[in-house]
Curated annotation (Swiss-Prot):
UniProt entry tagged with the keyword Coiled coil: no
The species this protein was found in: Kineococcus radiotolerans (strain ATCC BAA-149 / DSM 14245 / SRS30216)
Subcellular location: Cytoplasm
Spans through the membrane: none
The keyword Disulfide bond is assigned to this record: no
One annotated GO biological process: cysteinyl-tRNA aminoacylation
Signal peptide: none
Top enzyme category: ligase
Record GO terms (molecular function): ATP binding; cysteine-tRNA ligase activity; zinc ion binding
Encoding gene per record: cysS
Name used for this protein in its record: Cysteine--tRNA ligase
Amino acid sequence: MTLHLHDSAAGAVREFAPLVPGQVGIYVCGATPQGSPHLGHVRAQVVFDVLRRWLVRSGYEVTLVRNVTDIDDKILAKAAEAGTEWWAHAYRFEREFSAAYAALGVLPPTVEPRATGHVPEMVELIQRLVERGHAYAAADGSGDVYFDVRSWPAYGELTHQRLDDMEPAADADPRGKRDPRDFALWKGAKPGEPATASWATPWGRGRPGWHLECSAMAGRYLGPRFDVHGGGLDLRFPHHENEQAQSRAAGDGFANFWLHNHFVTMSGEKMSKSLGNVLGVPHLLETHRAVVLRYYLVSGHYRTHLEHSENSLVEAEAAYSRLEGLLRRAAERLGGLAAGEVPAAFAAAMDDDLATPTALAVLHETARAGNSALAAGDEAALRTAAGQLRAGLDVLGLDPFAEPWASQTTGSDAARTALDVLVRARLEDRATARATKDFATADAVRDSLKSAGIVIEDTPTGARWALEGEQ
């Protein structure tokens, strides 16, 4: 089976074929670092990290570009409220986002451009649009430059909307616009704004519009046409619609596929700062393992909303621990464990529009087969099942023997180590009792451990233990 992905522009699942055989270019909208990252922010990056890993596993060379919108109206406003320089404010939260991505095992992008480092490319793109009759400088002398939506008949094709049904663009004062739906390519500097937040252009000093930034950076690093543009569902309109319109109006083919992940929700509502229902990533990592947080984020299909409740991460911890536990017991029994090939059913699920819930179900079934092989002492079957499990978890960024998880010592890991010491001491007491035929004491030890949720497995090489539900 070949990879099929849902293309938002087509409104359907299509067979994926890269523009250049063997190579895939992906642009993912990154952070606007105005505040700390929350669970909804990082879902998008985990989703496209999984896509990247699956493409690499499938033999492609992947270039992934993830931008940083480090100049924006919201950044200027937040920095002014905090009494800090706008660039310092942006950099502070950019580092928080980078730390959150790294904590969740998101691979570094091939390129991570900042908007402020690509103003010349943005000015050049505006000039092309002006020359082609698709952009104009505001007549009020504000220094604003707008995209003329009525000059581009295909405007609205990405989101399947008619122009006359759209709301006015709220990114600038409408007084200088020919049509209220025209959107800003360049924003003229305004009184009271920091001088450092503007650049000289043929239209006066100012700063780039949000939509223009991504088009210019995507073109700079991926060329005029590339394979996949990704981002959250909330970016489809107006951001991605505007990106596509301005890029194609300038003569670029732009993205061949558009992929959009859905939201993390709480009580059915999108997680957002404006609603005050966000769960900050740094806060969550104080009480939960990062790998469990990632497991939770990949447990739902990327095109469905992921409902979060107080039990979500508890359930994710239990589910991941079952997979992790089998791998650790297999590695102990086999003296090490190499990744094998992913199960065929896992590959089929991933090729079916990244059906990660189905892929995880396959891995849990594989783990059950591994546990059966372990109990039966069938090391060949154990090696096969555990190797397949490890390979599948690696695609999802969840392999406990790979970085960043292999080198982490979390509070949960430390607790597991301490528990292991205590249980092994009790198992030694049980072994001594059995050796002296004191079976009453041996049974009492076993029963006390069982009542604590610890299951004992007697093997030819000695007793082993697991938490109930892991075996």
